[in-house]
Amino acid sequence: MAVLTDEQIDAAMPDLDGWERADGALRRSIKFPSFLDGIDAVRRVAEHAESKDHHPDIDIRWRTVTFALVTHSEGGITQNDVDMARDINGIVGS
């Protein structure tokens, strides 16, 4: 899978509510009502990611969960990352 160009990534961003492009990855931080709500969201995203064999980096800080997407094997953001960002929005809400 090819790394997307800057133009392709910029074109995808308006459809990725809550996501930003930072440090070569797509990132979204979400503050949940409680720690356990955040953990539940991580579990749901993890199950979906496992089924797609495309796994986000996930950072958990009390009620704030940050998802980061980059295809490490390709060295950048690919269509799989854009698709997974959309999927995560569908799972946790945009």
From Swiss-Prot:
Task: Identify the HAMAP family for this entry.
Answer: Pterin_4_alpha
Cross-referenced PANTHER family: PTERIN-4-ALPHA-CARBINOLAMINE DEHYDRATASE
Q: What name has this protein been given in UniProt?
A: Putative pterin-4-alpha-carbinolamine dehydratase
Q: Which Gene3D superfamilies match?
A: Transcriptional coactivator/pterin dehydratase (3.30.1360.20)
What does the record list as GO biological process? tetrahydrobiopterin biosynthetic process
Q: Which family does it belong to?
A: Belongs to the pterin-4-alpha-carbinolamine dehydratase family.
Q: Which organism is it from?
A: Mycolicibacterium paratuberculosis (strain ATCC BAA-968 / K-10)
Protein keywords: Lyase
Q: GO molecular function, one example?
A: 4-alpha-hydroxytetrahydrobiopterin dehydratase activity
